[in-house]
Curated annotation (Swiss-Prot):
EC number: 1.5.1.5, 3.5.4.9
The protein's name in its UniProt record: Bifunctional protein FolD
Domain of life: Bacteria
Catalysed reactions, semicolon-separated: (6R)-5,10-methylene-5,6,7,8-tetrahydrofolate + NADP(+) = (6R)-5,10-methenyltetrahydrofolate + NADPH; (6R)-5,10-methenyltetrahydrofolate + H2O = (6R)-10-formyltetrahydrofolate + H(+)
GO cellular component labels: cytosol
Amino-acid positions noted as binding NADP(+) in the UniProt annotation, renumbered to this chain: G169, R170, G171, S196, I237
Stored InterPro entries: Aminoacid_DH-like_N_sf (IPR046346), NAD(P)-bd_dom_sf (IPR036291), THF_DH/CycHdrlase (IPR000672), THF_DH/CycHdrlase_cat_dom (IPR020630), THF_DH/CycHdrlase_NAD-bd_dom (IPR020631)
Length: 300
């Protein structure tokens, strides 16, 4: 058996094409979606990540609003920048790029974000809505990586309802919100969330119809852990140094040999990562469409 590749690049491209159509419709109404980014410091990885988001925006027709602060910015500087993004009508949604410099309370800064402009879907208010909204349509932004995982599974016709999903990792950006999302009515999965204190994690993974590895441990999930035919999504990334060349490379949580056992497998890179970026755009477009509906209601 050779796994069907869950191609995140191709799937994200399809999502972005659909978003571009919706964005054109918004522009025809005089509404231009805008994504803001707040970057503090000059970390090369963060700069590259933010630049990629703005390239995505240009590709689909979303305006970019970029706020860059120096590495020695104070917490007051960051607070002022967030307040500016909250009040700027050109900003439909925005992100605060992490990590922030030492001495700045990240959680306190993130809580200052207007929940309606939370493009990452990780504001406490929006996570709370995900907890409470077990059925019906959610109008609040969803965490991007969990939403991207669900979107990719659905587009590849991988069954979710009634399936046993094992998530390796309980982080805030993937593990915890993914469990909440997958157990909502309409998706109806049974989810086991594993972590460093889980007993016999291999046995837990072997029971899974869908495995999501999001812990940041290189090649943790081995072929013998995986039930034949299971769908496996490789989310975690670790920077591993090649002892022969001395060069670092990005490595996923899933051993490549899992491809000979799994029914579906997302590569890493080019798997879930592009879907995360696409769902960030989707959150911005959804917020713009919400604003359009509110404007129409006010006009009567």
């Amino acid at each position: 058996m050779t796994a069907v590749v869950l191609d995140g690049v191709a799937t994200a491209s399809a999502v972005k094409s659909e978003l571009a159509v919706r964005i054109r419709a918004l522009r025809e109404q005089g509404l231009v979606p805008g994504l803001g980014t707040l970057l503090v410091g000059d970390d090369p990885g963060s700069r590259s990540y933010v630049a990629g988001k703005h390239r995505d925006c240009a590709e689909v027709g979303i305006e970019s609003i970029r706020v860059d602060l120096p590495a020695d910015a104070t917490e007051a500087d960051v607070r002022t920048a967030i307040e500016r993004l909250n009040s700027d009508p050109a900003v439909t949604g925005y992100i605060v790029q992490l990590p922030l410099p030492a001495g700045i309370d990240e959680n306190a800064m993130l809580e200052l974000i207007d929940p309606s402009k939370d493009a990452d879907g990780l504001h406490p208010t929006n996570l709370g809505r995900l907890v409470l909204g077990v059925q019906g349509e959610l109008t609040s932004p969803l965490p991007c990586t969990p939403a991207g995982i669900v979107e990719m599974l659905q587009r590849y016709d991988v069954p979710i309802a009634g399936q046993h999903v094992v998530v390796v990792g309980r982080g805030l950006t993937v593990g915890r919100p993914l469990g909440l999302l997958l157990t909502r009515k309409g998706l109806d999965a049974t989810v086991t969330l594993t972590h460093s204190r889980t007993r016999d994690i291999e046995q837990e993974v072997r029971r899974a119809d869908i495995v999501v590895a999001a812990v940041g441990a290189a090649h943790l999930v081995k072929p013998e852990w995986v039930k034949p035919g299971a769908a496996v999504l490789d989310v975690g990334i670790t920077r591993v140094v090649d002892p022969e060349t001395g060069k670092a490379r990005l490595t996923g949580d899933v051993d490549p040999a899992v491809a000979e056992v799994a029914g579906h497998l997302s590569p890493n890179p080019r798997g879930v990562g592009p879907m995360t970026r696409a769902m960030l755009l989707a959150n911005v477009v959804q917020a713009a469409e919400r604003d359009a509906r509110l404007a129409a209601e006010l006009r009567g």
